[in-house]
Amino acid sequence: MARSIWKGPFVDGYLIKKVQKLMKSGKSEMIKTWSRRSTILPLFVGFTFSVHNGNKFIPVYINEEMVGRKLGEFAPTRTFHGHGADKKVKRK
C-alpha cells in the first residue's frame, strides 16, 4: 500500500541537513547513509549517496528519473548465484 499523499514523502532529517550543508560548501562528496527508507527528493539530484545494503556501502548517483523512489531500491541486498544444478543423471 502506498503512502498517503497528505503525509508527504518520508526523508530522514539528518539526510536533508547533510545535502544542504554540501550545497552551501560547494563540495561534491559522497553522503554515507544507512537510511534505505528515505524518499529521493529533487533536492538530491546530482549528489552521490553511499547506501548501506547490510554488508557494504553501494555508491548511488542520483538523477532526475530516481525522484520519488527510495534510496534502498538502488542498493540490492541479495546476491543471486544461480539456481542449483540438477543432480540427477539424465539418460536417453
Curated annotation (Swiss-Prot):
One of its GO terms (biological process) is ribosomal small subunit assembly. The keyword Ribonucleoprotein applies. GO terms for cellular component: cytoplasm; small ribosomal subunit. It holds the Pfam family Ribosomal_S19. InterPro entries: Ribosomal_uS19, Ribosomal_uS19_bac-type, Ribosomal_uS19_CS, Ribosomal_uS19_SF. It comes from the Bacteria. Protein S19 forms a complex with S13 that binds strongly to the 16S ribosomal RNA. This is Small ribosomal subunit protein uS19. It comes from Rickettsia typhi (strain ATCC VR-144 / Wilmington).
